[in-house]
Structure formats: structure tokens, C-alpha cells
Regions:
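Sec/Tat signal peptide C-region and signal peptidase I cleavage site
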Residues: 16-20
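Amphipathic, charged alpha-helical segments and their helix-to-coil junctions
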Residues: 21-186
């Protein structure tokens, strides 16, 4: 009788362990994706966007066009391109060294955002510096997605190494960055 009870207990424990082993671990968050937000460091994404092949190609083409205009004596075209490039550089500085919005970079990713959101299990993306937007989401509903967005820009290896420094650095306050940029010190 004692043997039967021990055998019954052993079989019961084994069956319980086997059923438990076949259950998938629940790593999935309990919050539905629509209620979760993917947060990203806009400075890092802006840097990746700047160094992406299409952006570097565009910059080379604009510089070549400026050079051609200058050589042809077309001062108006040269001045317009120079102003455009200056504004682009200023915008980039405010995005990379501070917390300015990165609308152009996110627009480039627009077609991929639904797939990236599904991959991350989030309903939307918000800059980690956008405190007003983040107030709508509790801490446990925030998912870090910076690296997920950055990988879309397919950075060259030297630029990838620079990203870690940006992640650790504290951004300049936007007003201070604007002042430094206007003074040519950013």
C-alpha cells in the first residue's frame, strides 16, 4: 500500500512537472500594445539619420551643386544652397546635441513604423525627452526602442560606435543649444 501511494505521488508530481514544462513562459507584457509606448532617444536617432547613406549622398549632391553654381558664377543659386545647408546643419545640431524634434528622421521611417511597432509590441513612438506626451503612459507601459529605430538607418561601423557616447551624455537644454548654435559654438 505504501508503495502504491509513493508511486501515485511520484506519477502525480511527474505529470505536474511535465505539464508545467510545456507551458510557454509568459514574457509577454500584460498591457496591450496600444496602451504601450515605444520611447526613443531622439538624439541618437537623429545622429543615425544624419549618417545614413541617403542623407550623406544628399549632402554630397547639394555641396556639388553649390560648387557648380559658384564656378558658373550663379551667386543666387550658390547662396540659396549655402543657406539651405546652414539651416540643415543647425537643425541637425539641435537634434543631436539637444532635444529638438526629429520629424525628418521619423518621416523617413514612416512606412516601417507599423512593422516596428508590432515588433516592439507598442502602439506608438514618443521621444524620451517629450515629457508632456510621456505623462499619458505609466513607467511600466514604456518600452525602449532606440536601437530598433537606429538599425533602420544601417549606419557605418565607425558611427555605430559613437552612439554609445550619445546615449550616456545628458542633452543640452534646447534654449541653451539654440543660443550656442546661433553663436556658432555648437
Amino acid at each position: 500500500m505504501k508503495t502504491n501511494i509513493l508511486l501515485f505521488l511520484f506519477v502525480g508530481l511527474f505529470a505536474h512537472a511535465a505539464v508545467g514544462a510545456t507551458e510557454a513562459p509568459t514574457d509577454k507584457p500584460t498591457t496591450p500594445p496600444a496602451a504601450r509606448v515605444g520611447i526613443y532617444d531622439s538624439r541618437v536617432v537623429a545622429y543615425a539619420y544624419f549618417w545614413s547613406a541617403p542623407q550623406q549622398q544628399m549632402a554630397k549632391e547639394r555641396m556639388a551643386a553649390a560648387k557648380t553654381a559658384k564656378a558658373a558664377g550663379d551667386q543666387a543659386t550658390y547662396a540659396a544652397i549655402a543657406q539651405e545647408m546652414k539651416e540643415r546643419q543647425s537643425r541637425s545640431h539641435l537634434q543631436v546635441f539637444s532635444t529638438a524634434p526629429i520629424d525628418e528622421a521619423m518621416a523617413v521611417l514612416n512606412d516601417r513604423l507599423p512593422q516596428l511597432a508590432a515588433q516592439a509590441g507598442v502602439g506608438k513612438f514618443v521621444s524620451k525627452w517629450d515629457e508632456a506626451a510621456l505623462q499619458k503612459f505609466p513607467e511600466d507601459a514604456r518600452v525602449e526602442v532606440t536601437d530598433l529605430l537606429v538599425q533602420e538607418f544601417k549606419l557605418p561601423e565607425p558611427q555605430k560606435k559613437m552612439l554609445e557616447g550619445f546615449k550616456r551624455a545628458t542633452p543640452l537644454p534646447l534654449d541653451e543649444a539654440r543660443r550656442l548654435d546661433a553663436a556658432g559654438k555648437l
